[in-house]
């Protein structure tokens, strides 16, 4: 209470910051008259001179901010017909300073971004603008591209339909690049699998502005980006595990904890499962894979629902993003869960994959020197943005006061009563022509509502993951007279719902939420579809005690109130107390999800340090000017020390005890280089090591003398890269396995994260050693040919090919000759070579008595 009073009197930190920004915006306004009178050419020239002063280092971006913003605003007026409001200038400054601008729907975030983009692109390092889908990336690049072009900037777009590296490289070479978070992230991973620096498409990570920043950095942060390949594991086990899972009974054989999304087998369930699999101990080491498959099969059948968590599309299981409601094409659940869902639905089971490269969005976006974001809903997650990304959220006032009325929630006992009330409300609004946007939490619920509206013969449009392609078109029309639009969470983010004067007089767009989402932000986004730029509107949520949020996370307080009131069929309760109880349930879930994301990040931070070290080394190998000869020298010695250890030849051991035969066998096998025993006999440890090192180096130098110095370096770098990539892939597989089982250490009173850090460090040391030894083995085993040998080999191949062609031509000619002459006219002497080309005399081949053979045989 006291805190709220203090805020009212003195203002919040946010209010004070906005006040300072407004004062700075006034200075930009003072420059407006100066640039208004300039011709287009003079305006362009003024901007170019600012750019040059920044690139020469004469001025900083902050020095030219006022002029840059003033010129960008004037250019926007001329080419787009849009002038930035003062609050939009504030938003531009917030973005430039690497913060998050929270701006309500319809406040023109796309236009705000142009101010920060135009300023930061002056450095010539490239600016990335990240959007949630390809449609928005293309739309914004096209619409804003006219402005950037006027200012002398090139614009690129990175979308899923760009397949070639050359096309992507061309787009990334632009001053301003629009694209989706997935495309930027995957390009980074693919770049770090390339074998040449020139093939890399992403050149820098200087500055990124993330549109709908909450959706990308919060909602999608639990899903890492993974490039994978086949893991070659048996697929039959998934079908067997699914049939065993279906034979088990809930409560009797297993318990389901929906809150924590965990399924546990009972003692009786374990026995039943062992019977189903035909094994004695489900949890023995040899059956570990079966217990894992069963766990995933139970989850697939009891925690994942079709048309809510996934859909079947063209015979494939496709994930539905729980926050956006969109289909996540190409994305698959990991750890065998996707295969378990395929077994459950009876579709083709695709091979389980092995990670080749991965990164979380948290760690990808932290690569940027400067990061900023914008969204309509960020304050509820302000602490997470600050903790994880060091991004401060600034709420920017609307240009016009929001007129939308946000009404209290209505709570019904059952889902049936709730939907009946929703239909009645839609009917009432539809009769007077007021447009309605109905938000649902899943495809299943949107299709239920669709069938109820059909029964009532109310015309409507459905927008869910199954109509993704028509999304923008459908959402644009949601503000028309009499429009009834049912939408899942996607609700066309980034697309404005505009209304005309007639709709304003009817009360504007009416929002009905049929369920509270686990996150308050998603509810606020739905509300934000109405009341843009001072338009009237209203929003209300209809809930029931059967909704997932209230059933799993809600307190008993609401249920007790409803029981005491003894509500009749169709009656509801509506009060601020109930709305607050619902928000408390949401806060619980948000807190749980935050812990989950934080947990994921803590684990990925461990892998991220290793990833950075490996990628840094990889980039050094790709750099042709980087000399790795000293590394080869060091590794050769380390490799030989390891070899001596394998042969049980250790420092301090008497030389008479050395097993030289074993050492010779290992040396020849490891390096494909023979060495005589006499060279090694009677030598002490250090002398023995030096002899081996000298012999190996001499052999290597002799081999490499067949090529010039540049070719030698290329061969060394290429072999190192191949060894590094193979070892890194294997390392990622081991890290995946480690992460899967590390949670069990908690039962042994050990912190799983601490254990993971220890174990992963040991694995990383093994990786480094493995790269050392395998690269030495590959380099010394390589077979090179001299130029003369190569030419001789080529001549031999050409001669062999020539002989083959001659024989084929001879046979073809013979075929032609005999096919055009009757047999009776063929006159061949008995001692002549047989015309069939066999090389035998005619009398011993086709001229023999008896049935004819070869070309002269009767058809």
From Swiss-Prot:
May bind 1 zinc ion per subunit. It is an enzyme of class 7 (translocase). It is found in: Cell inner membrane; Cytoplasm. It is a peripheral membrane protein. GO terms for biological process: intracellular protein transmembrane transport; protein import; protein targeting; protein transport by the Sec complex. It comes from the Bacteria. Its cofactor is Zn(2+). ATP binds at residues 88, 106-110, 496. GO terms for cellular component: cell envelope Sec protein transport complex; cytosol; plasma membrane. Zn(2+) binds at residues 834, 836, 845-846. GO terms for molecular function: ATP binding; metal ion binding; protein-exporting ATPase activity. Keywords: ATP-binding, Cell inner membrane, Cell membrane, Cytoplasm, Membrane, Metal-binding, Nucleotide-binding, Protein transport, Translocase, Translocation, Transport, Zinc. Pfam families: P-loop_SecA, SEC-C, SecA_DEAD, SecA_PP_bind, SecA_SW. Its main location: membrane. It catalyses: ATP + H2O + cellular proteinSide 1 = ADP + phosphate + cellular proteinSide 2. Monomer and homodimer. Part of the essential Sec protein translocation apparatus which comprises SecA, SecYEG and auxiliary proteins SecDF-YajC and YidC. Part of the Sec protein translocase complex. Interacts with the SecYEG preprotein conducting channel. Has a central role in coupling the hydrolysis of ATP to the transfer of proteins into and across the cell membrane, serving as an ATP-driven molecular motor driving the stepwise translocation of polypeptide chains across the membrane. This is Protein translocase subunit SecA.
